[in-house]
Amino acid sequence: MKQLIIASIAFIGLSFAANAQYDSKGDSIPSKFRPGAMWFFTGWRPASIEKVRKYDRLIFDITYNDWIGDKNLFENHWGSIGLNTNLMFDIPLTKGNTVSIGTGLSHSYHVTRHNGHLDGIDSLGITVWQPKQPTDNFRKSLLGGHSFSVPLELRFHKESWRHFKVHIGGKVGIQTSMYNKYVTGQWLDRDVTKSYKFPDQNFFLYSAHIRLGFRNWALFGSYNFNTIFSNPNSIQLNRVQMGLSISLF
């Protein structure tokens, strides 16, 4: 059943992407309809030469996840890796598509490996962080979760398909799950414990982001304006992401 659901979601996503294929402009590069892995794919319909090219509709952001506030940047483990998957529409605002708007749906899987204690105290309605003690037997601990959001971007790039690009935008979304995970032992003796008890978890999120790059590749940075935990007496942390964006088509 799980495999069927995953396959259905993948098929629906590909159907939307295929119907939103974009065409080329100009006779000098008739085969270059889009960059990346889907370069020669024009969707269910043949491409029309006279229409402008469009870009960056399926974007993967491979990110290092951190936070800032009561804890400083780069104090967490380097293995705090996450993935944003963005299924976007590129809406041209100019004839050569040098300025456009990007919007769609984004899913984010984030992991922040803090290697400490992050515990919710229900009686006080707060969440606290404490460093690992010598008596603790866990090998690593991390904060992980999933969120869905609607991005909105203003995009600038040169008309050439070998273009330099800048994306400036933001997201509004919902944190659908968040947990703290403790891992003890190795291999066959490995034991994992998850805790979802955060009495003041912020379910809504809003952030700003930027991409700066060339053709299929870009550097990515993101900052969440709202804190992870809402109670002012909790540890105050704003999520930060930085990494590399890859646009397949």
Where are the language model's segments positioned?
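Cleavable N-terminal export/targeting peptides
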Residues: M1-A47
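Short loop/turn motifs that connect adjacent beta-strands in outer-membrane beta-barrel proteins
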Residues: W44-D56, P92-V99, E159-F164
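Residues that define the transmembrane beta-barrel architecture of outer-membrane proteins
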Residues: K54-D56, H77-L83, G144-F148, N202-Y206, ...
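Surface-exposed strand-loop-strand hairpins of Gram-negative outer-membrane beta-barrel proteins
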Residues: N65-N86, F229-N231
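Structural signature of outer-membrane beta-barrel domains
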Residues: N65-W67, S106-T112, G173-S177, S222-I228, ...
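Predominantly the C-terminal beta-signal and adjacent terminal strand-loop region
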Residues: W67, S195-F249
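Extracellular/periplasm-exposed beta-strand and loop segments of Gram-negative cell-envelope proteins
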Residues: K71-W78, T112-G145, Q175-W187, V192-S207
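Residues on the lipid-exposed face of transmembrane beta-strands in outer-membrane beta-barrel proteins
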Residues: T85-I91, L105-H107, V150-F156, I168-I174, ...
